């Protein structure tokens, strides 16, 4: 454990950020899975709504640095193809 006051604060801050990042990433993954589920069921309306939500979460994750911008584009493109195929 750190002894210096600023280092102790950095440990606490890093833990808070880690927890927030895990939540954001998990939320993004859940949104992606929702689109895939609705698409496999053939439910275009719900898949489209879920795609819009997932797209927003993917963009936010890329902006926060949780995922690379190329991965964000790739994921959105893949989901868009999935929804448009319905």
Swiss-Prot record:
Highest taxon of source: Bacteria
GO process terms (BP): translation
Pfam families xrefs: Ribosomal_S20p
Keywords: Ribonucleoprotein, Ribosomal protein, RNA-binding, rRNA-binding
GO CC, any one term: cytosol
GO molecular function, one term: small ribosomal subunit rRNA binding
UniProt key word RNA-binding: yes
Family: Belongs to the bacterial ribosomal protein bS20 family.
PANTHER family: 30S RIBOSOMAL PROTEIN S20 (PTHR33398), SMALL RIBOSOMAL SUBUNIT PROTEIN BS20C (PTHR33398:SF1)
HAMAP family (alphabetical): Ribosomal_bS20
Function comment: Binds directly to 16S ribosomal RNA.
Name listed for the protein in its UniProt record: Small ribosomal subunit protein bS20
Species of origin: Exiguobacterium sibiricum (strain DSM 17290 / CCUG 55495 / CIP 109462 / JCM 13490 / 255-15)
Name of the gene this protein is made from: rpsT
């Amino acid at each position: 454990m750190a002894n210096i006051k600023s280092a102790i604060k950095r440990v606490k801050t890093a833990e808070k950020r880690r927890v927030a990042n895990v939540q954001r990433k998990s939320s993004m993954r859940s949104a992606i899975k929702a689109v895939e589920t609705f698409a496999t069921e053939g439910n275009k309306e719900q898949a489209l709504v879920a795609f819009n939500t997932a797209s927003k979460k993917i963009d936010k994750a890329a902006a926060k640095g949780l995922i690379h911008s190329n991965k964000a584009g790739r994921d959105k493109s893949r989901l868009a193809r999935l929804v448009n195929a319905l």
